[in-house]
Structure formats: C-alpha cells, structure tokens
Amino acid sequence: YVLDDGTNTAYQYSLSTAWDISSASYASKSFSSFSETSPTGIYFSSDGTKLYVTGFVSDAVSESNLSTPWDISTASLSQSFSIFSQTSLPTGVFFSPDGTKMFVSDTSADSIFKYVLSSAWDVSTASFSQSLSVTSEETNPQDIFLSPTGTKMFITGQNGVVIDEYSLSTAWDLSTATYSTSFSTSSQESNLRGAFFKVDGSKMYVVGVNNDTIYQYSTD
C-alpha cells in the first residue's frame, strides 16, 4: 500500500512473492475518501479491516472500515480523532498489534506522541498519554515504526536522510526510549517519507519523494 499526497489517494499493490517488491504489480484498487487533502501517514489494523490515515490539513487520524479485509477499494470512512492539541504537522501513524496504543510522528515539535485507546482500534476512544522529543537525532521526522514487541522504535528522518533506531527498556513506553544507531539511505533516496519492516525484522522497506520508488533492504 502506497499513500500519495499528490493525488490524495492510497494505492494497493499485489506481490506474487511475499515481501519481494520486485514481484509487485498495481492491483487497480485505490481509496481517497479519508477526509484529508494532504495525507502523510497510513496504517492498517492487524486483521486488515481498518485503515488509518493522518495528514497536515485535518491534523487528525481518520479511521475507515474495509468490508473485505485488505481490499482498499472496499474502504469507507468511519470516524476521525483530532490530534491538533499535540501536533499541527503529523507525518506518520502506527498502532501496537493489539490496537490499544497509537503513535504519531510530528514535524512541528519534532516529537513522537503516544495515545491509549480504551477500545482497541477505535480512534474515538483515544486519549493522549506521553511524548518523546527526537530533536537531538532528527529535526524533521516523517514516519514511525515499532517492533511487534514494542522494544524497538524506528524514526524516518528527512533532514538526516536516515532511519533512526531507539531501544525501549519498557515495551511501548516512550519515556524509556534511548537512541541506539542510524542507517543512511542517501545512496538511494535523499528525501525520505516512510519506512516499514517485515514482521520478523529481516527486511526493511523505504520510500521517498525524489525518486518515487520503494527500496527493499535486508537487515539480517
């Protein structure tokens, strides 16, 4: 799935070989009715029945329902949750696997914000929990990803053209995050927008706006 802020649309691709982007082809499926005219971040629930989008104009996270799991053409807007009290420039959105924690990356404060959902995957039940400034490492964070265990966090940085890695001594708790290392993508893309990892962490996928290309890396 790729989110395009030029057309304000999310596009779906099919991979004939799992996790191999060289086998990807456009599935002729898209969705654009997520109440955001400058979308920046996209995320799906674990079962593929919900789609979340954030962006600069609404300063909110929208929630859409998919009547057929993982088929983006069956999505319909359900509701949205304003995050304007914390950020006016949200760039990425991520959820814990159980849908009870939501994380948003932000370029207005160069921070990561955490929200707790009293009802899993229901953004209307979200409440602000904590924040983490990443200014020391990155002054223009574009996306966020956490490992399934919640003990590793990765921030996509536009200014540094790197993926920054953090360790969390307490799972999902931003107050326990410490910077570990970074990986530069400047040889492939110098204007980063997003990063995603395979479930087992063995592959990393990065996208940027300079080349409009997705790059696949092996991490093992």
Regions found by a protein language model. Name each.
Residues 38, 89, 140, 191:
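Beta-rich catalytic cores
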Residues 46-47, 97-98, 148-149, 199-200:
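Residue-level detector of Asp-centered blade-edge/turn motifs that repeat once per structural unit
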